[in-house]
């Protein structure tokens, strides 16, 4: 059996990890053993937060819609229920955008929701 020297492979792997850890503080960006842990943990956080980002944006949209709906004298849940009954199919992302940038259009939507509930 021939002897296998792994220097090139190991160096390449070390370089890859240290490149990923570039910008980290202290030993996390310089020492391979510490950098591996830091990069692994960063990957776990990234994986988790890609899923959490979707939840957080939905929470933000709902908070904005709720605030705008209450300014027009209606709660969030009644507003959404009214829109469904009025068969207005606008998602929360667009509703939040309208609430922030176009108050008149949002007021019209609130009136439509009130009309459907009455």
UniProtKB/Swiss-Prot annotation:
The keyword rRNA-binding applies. GO terms for molecular function: rRNA binding; structural constituent of ribosome. GO terms for cellular component: ribonucleoprotein complex; ribosome. GO terms for biological process: ribosomal large subunit assembly; translation. Keywords: Ribonucleoprotein, Ribosomal protein, RNA-binding, rRNA-binding. Gene3D superfamilies: 6.10.160.10, Ribosomal protein L20 (1.10.1900.20). Binds directly to 23S ribosomal RNA and is necessary for the in vitro assembly process of the 50S ribosomal subunit. It is not involved in the protein synthesizing functions of that subunit. Belongs to the bacterial ribosomal protein bL20 family. This is Large ribosomal subunit protein bL20. The gene is rplT.
């Amino acid at each position: 059996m021939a002897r296998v020297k792994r220097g090139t492979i190991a160096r390449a792997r070390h370089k890859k990890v240290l490149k990923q850890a570039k910008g980290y503080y202290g030993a996390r960006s310089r020492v391979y053993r510490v950098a591996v842990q830091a990069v692994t943990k960063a990957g776990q956080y990234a994986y988790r937060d890609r899923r959490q980002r979707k939840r957080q944006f939905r929470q933000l949209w709902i908070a904005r819609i709720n605030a705008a709906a209450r300014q027009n004298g209606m709660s969030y849940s009644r507003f959404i229920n009214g829109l469904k009954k009025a068969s207005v199919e606008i998602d929360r992302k667009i509703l939040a955008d309208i609430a922030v940038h176009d108050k008149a259009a949002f007021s019209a939507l609130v009136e439509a929701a009130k009309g459907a509930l009455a």
